[in-house]
Amino acid sequence: MDLPAATVANLSSRFLDYQYGVLGIETHMQSPDVTEICINRPGELYLETRAGWRREAVPSLTFERARQFCTSIVNESNTGQRITDADPMVSLTFPTGQRAQFVIPPACDAGRVSITIRLPSHTARTLDDYERDGFFADIPEQATAIADHDLELLALRRARDYAQFFRKAVLYRKNIVVSGATGSGKTTFMKSLVDHIPDQERLVTIEDARELFLAQPNIVHLLYSKGGQGTGNVTAKSCMEACLRMKPDRIILA
């Protein structure tokens, strides 16, 4: 899916640094180890480093501060954009290279704001650097044989051990489509699958009605109005575009 280019905001470094301080993320914005900063709910944020996702408690991070951060950044960006209940999703690129995705209600849960900031690399790397660090060792060779994971899944299917088949399919990160008639239990079955996603992964769900209440801690629920029934100018497509800027490990489209 090709994403529209995020608009470049015309903001001064001084203004941005002040806003980072108000939000309580200024230290993380300067960290060479952090590649992503994600705010899903008041009181905490998630940082992505080479070691994976890490939760940080931020008691001063309230809903009001998070929403005001979004409003201040977007309104002062000189891009002609506004973030409002009618247009609750905005993508921006900061002059200093960071890329941001902002989502406010009704496109996410009431009382929450989703802020995702992707930080550019602080160092330039050559192909020799990648070679020395073993980066290319993880590139799989083109194989004609069926992968071991798929052989295991085929064996489970032949044995009709479907509980283990689906459990393993989730752990092996296979794409799964759940379909059925209205009232056939699709959402309930989907929840049973999601239960097996590890807690250290970041999830983003996309729904037209809030039905997926999940236990994973690093999660954002995006909401769109089917048939233009809601107040927000949000579609499944715009949710997917926003989602791809939010660094999900898994996308759950309900």
Language-model region placement:
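N-terminal accessory targeting/assembly segments
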Residues: M1-T96
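Short acidic, glycine/serine/threonine-rich loops at helix termini
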Residues: R50-A51, D129, A215-N218
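Switch/coupling sub-region of P-loop NTPases
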Residues: A155-A159, A163-S179, S192-A254
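Walker A (P-loop) phosphate-binding loop of P-loop NTPases
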Residues: G183
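Conserved lysine of the Walker
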Residues: K186
